[in-house]
Amino acid sequence: MNIFYTKTYNMGGTNAVKQEIVEVSARKLGYDEISLFKFDDQSDSDEELKIRMEAITSPVTAGSTVIFQYPSMVGGRYDRFLTDALKKHQDLKLIFFVEDFGFEIYKEKYPDIENEIELLNRADLLILQSVQMKEYLKEHGLKEIPVIYQVMWDYPYEKVDN
């Protein structure tokens, strides 16, 4: 069984820092990276984006586990195509590590909570920041999905040079 984590490149801010924190831990545990790149996904047709996702997810095999650092900050459409490609793998376990709500920080690409809930409902496990976050998501339609809480972000780590 292989374990993967996603990391989005070409973005800044606190979401980039959060992704780096997860990256450091994931590398120490021997997990493999699925590299995502922030770009205007609207420049791809649906077929082009589907092909892109097949290439991005090509290292993933049946029985793998993928930790998706959500949101990717590319956009809801991109995230939906990514999860579609991942879910094609037999016995795949998809974990959403919810670092923020896209609709609160990137409204142009994540227009509303309903689309985000649809994505989150694809998960086999959620990593959330708090019980309050889970309750908020449930109020907006989140199904019963197992949850782990990651409540602390501000801890020291060594930056990984690629």
For each of these PLM feature ranges, what is it?
Residues 1-3, 161-162:
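A short, charged/proline- and glycine-enriched loop
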Residues 1-2, 32, 93, 124-125, ...:
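Residues at the starts of beta-strands that form the adenosine-phosphate
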Residues 4-5, 96:
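Structural beta-sheet core signal
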Residues 5-21, 73-75:
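A short, glycine/small-residue-rich beta-strand->loop->alpha-helix junction that serves as a flexible
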Residues 6, 29-46:
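A short beta-strand-loop structural module common to alpha/beta enzyme folds
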Residues 16-24, 131-134:
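Short, surface-exposed alpha-helical segments at coil->helix boundaries
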Residues 45-136:
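Extended catalytic core of nucleotide-activated donor transferases of GT-like folds
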Residues 124-138, 142-161:
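Donor nucleotide-sugar binding/catalytic pocket of nucleotide-sugar-dependent glycosyltransferases
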